[in-house]
Amino acid sequence: MRVGFFISSLSGGGAEKVLITIAQSMADNNIGSVSITSLEKRPQFYQVDEEKVELYKIKNKHTGIRAFWEDFISIRKHIKNDNAEVMISFLSRCNLLLLLCCLFNNRKIIVCDRNNPLKEHSRVIFWLSCLLYKRANRIVVQTNQIKTFYPRFLQKKIVVIENPIDNHKLQNELCRDGYNTKRVISMGRLEPQKDFETLIKAFAEINKQFSDWKLDIYGTGEKQEIIQKLIDDLNLTSTVCLCGRTEKPVMEMSKSDIFVLSSYYEGFPNVLCEAMYAGCACISTDCVSGPRELIEQKLNGTLVPIGDVSKMKQALLTYIKNEDIRQKNGKNAQRTVERLYVNNIMKKWRELIEQVGENK
């Protein structure tokens, strides 16, 4: 079977990483021939073994409506020349483009929404998207909570598959020479969704009592200057660092004691999964969706209300003051995410692709 993947870019991001993991795993295990088509809207960050996976890059320079039209023409031309039996699209824009291109044919399509659709779009756009999603053979979402957001007429098409952890690859990044590094770590795009401001303000309070602890934030984005100014204004330049991107996030996590996810919303937070895999004591906002399906309160991590500096500070203090709790929660977290190991998740993807390919 030939399977074609579609995505807007292969830049740094959770959806891009998941697509690469699934496509590469299929190719490595000889599950048919695999291709990836990227619209190249941002520079490529994630790499793929091009000896096993065919990589196509569609480069259109325009923005807005013109870009959408040009991408539509390019994708339509591409799929006419490609004989993929099943096409799998990631992220809303690419999903809509692929469905529009195949509106009047019988190509088999799986679309994957990777975020909270009610936060990502206006309600009008969401409902228009849902009408177009009727054309898809299957819709993949990451959590049961996200599934409930979609209308009843789509429910039979929706399949919940959590994100995989590529444990075979990531085990080489683990670097646990010892605990008590006195390092807090966070990762994500420096954009409003991630709300790093709440974390930094909470850490500013921590710093007054535990000045030997450090906070490292990995990622880039539109709010970098604003976040750096907040760090400067709070006199945290010696203890809080914006570190840019890292190609080995799990290595950095495994050299840290505490991981924090401060987001307003998520689809299914890869970075939280990876931090749990690395054995960090994890703190996350109780946002929609994902954290609540991963964290059991105070057993393998801590959930705090969104945007609550005081509760974030309290959660940090609990871990900072109690190394035994940090280690216990970190080890429990590692056991929790074993269900996400790539072989376990790939079984679900293989079954889904075979069902769609056979028209079940």
Question: Which role does the model predict for each range below?
Answer:
Residues E296-V309, T318-D324:
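Conserved acidic donor-binding segment of nucleotide-sugar-dependent glycosyltransferases
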Residues R245, Y264:
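Aromatic "clamp/platform" in nucleotide-sugar-dependent glycosyltransferases that forms part
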Residues F5-R66, F149-P151:
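N-terminal strand-loop element at the rim of the active site
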Residues T37, A281-T285:
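Short hydrophobic beta-strand element within catalytic cores of glycosyltransferases
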Residues S89-L97, D113:
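Short His-centered aromatic/hydrophobic patch
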Residues D212, Q228, K311, T318, ...:
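A short, well-ordered alpha-helix in the C-terminal region of glycosyltransferases
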Residues G13-T21, K182, R189-K208, L215, ...:
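A conserved mid-protein helix/loop that constitutes part of the nucleotide-sugar donor-binding site
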Residues Q145, P164:
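Carbohydrate-associated surface elements
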